[in-house]
From Swiss-Prot:
Cellular component GO terms, alphabetical: cytosol
Tagged with keyword GTP-binding: no
Subcellular location as annotated: Cytoplasm
Natural source organism: Geotalea daltonii (strain DSM 22248 / JCM 15807 / FRC-32) (Geobacter daltonii)
Lineage, uppermost ranks: Bacteria, Pseudomonadati, Thermodesulfobacteriota, Desulfuromonadia, Geobacterales
Annotated PANTHER family: METHYLTETRAHYDROFOLATE:HOMOCYSTEINE METHYLTRANSFERASE RELATED, UROPORPHYRINOGEN DECARBOXYLASE
This protein's name: Uroporphyrinogen decarboxylase
Family, per entry: Belongs to the uroporphyrinogen decarboxylase family.
EC assignment: 4.1.1.37
Length: 339
């Protein structure tokens, strides 16, 4: 098996920089759209054979060094008692607003409530056995709570911020419950065979550094400390956290995911020996081949040859990117970083 990705997570030297892409199983791939055209998004997530098929597609098409489970961060929230739909984008019919709402939430029994996720992982471990490692993932407690309180996506997340300030006891009770659920969910993925875990805190960066430290850090730290992570590296990705990496680092984890607003070299200086993942601007993949190569080289140069770097985009690949551009990017990473 290609172990470059896992080796880099642990800061070990590798013969070339490993690379994978957030949302690498997605709408930019015609093969994905062929599968997706036959079912809804939720049906795809809940059908292990299909979820496994689309997980493997980018490994074969792009030549990436890791696969990431095809699912959605809100998958384990639905069995807490929150009806979820995608219309498009996630929408919860009854958002959490009061302590009574929080008290109604249940902690799912993962093997009974999300068996399709665990079965997908088991299928993938068999099918990827001689290829690449499998990354499991979940949303960070704060990002999950954002959707649960707002009921859908938001530009400013004012509803959950108002709860933080005006009803801190409700916010704390919700975050405790979501953190416990998250811990159970990610540990179930590890038990099923996930070889690494990525925690996505997509909205952590909407807070000030002091609010992040007060309202988010304790829960993410508790989550990471509660994972059964012997030989399973944890990647912590907080979008928009470039100005507070020293604070985010306190949560623990083995790899810091970086978005494209952060200079990778400066981030490494702040993070010390901690491995990093990132951080090409996703829109670079619309550029001509020579520009893609130049930008890949820039990111590699910012790393300065230090071990413990996994190449990735600074956020998910965009749906209208030409697949051949993503293939070219992966090839450039491998060729330019070859030792």
């Amino acid at each position: 098996m290609n172990t470059r990705f896992l080796d880099a997570c642990w800061g070990k030297p590798v013969d070339r920089t490993p690379v994978w892409l957030m949302r690498q199983a997605g709408r930019y791939l015609p093969d994905y759209m062929r599968v997706r055209s036959k079912c809804t998004f939720l049906e795809l997530c809940k059908t292990p054979e299909l979820a496994a098929e689309v997980t493997i597609q980018p490994v074969d098409i792009l030549g990436v060094d890791a696969a990431i489970l095809f699912s959605d961060i809100l998958t384990p929230v639905e069995p807490m008692g929150m009806a979820l739909d995608f219309v498009p984008g996630p929408v919860f019919e009854h958002p959490i607003r009061t302590m009574a709402d929080v008290e109604k939430l249940r902690i799912p029994q993962m093997e009974q409530d999300v068996p399709y996720v665990l079965e997908t992982i088991k299928i993938l471990r068999r099918e990827l056995a001689n290829k690449v490692p499998l990354i499991g993932f979940g949303g960070a407690p704060f990002t999950l709570a954002c959707y649960m309180v707002e009921g859908k996506g938001s530009k400013d997340w004012a509803t959950i911020k108002r709860m933080m300030y005006a009803a801190p006891e409700v916010y704390a009770a919700l975050m405790e419950k979501v953190t416990m659920m998250d811990m159970e969910y990610l540990n179930a993925q590890i038990k099923a065979g996930a070889q690494a875990i990525q925690i996505f805190d997509t909205w952590g960066g909407v807070l000030s550094p002091s609010d992040y430290e007060k309202f988010v850090l304790p829960y993410t730290t508790k989550l990471i400390n509660g994972l059964n992570r012997q030989n399973v590296p944890v990647i912590h990705f907080v979008k928009g956290a470039g100005t507070m990496l020293d604070t985010v680092k306190k949560a623990g984890g083995d790899v810091m995911g970086l978005d494209w607003h952060t200079n990778l070299g400066k981030a490494r200086d702040i993070l010390g020996s901690m491995a990093v993942q990132g951080n090409l601007d996703p829109t670079v993949l619309f550029a001509p081949n020579d520009v893609i190569e130049k930008e890949v080289k820039r990111v590699l140069d910012e790393n300065g040859g230090r071990s413990g770097h996994i190449f990735n985009l600074g956020h998910g690949i965009l749906p209208t990117v030409p697949p051949e551009n993503a293939i070219h990017m992966v090839e450039c990473v491998h060729r330019l970083s070859q030792q």
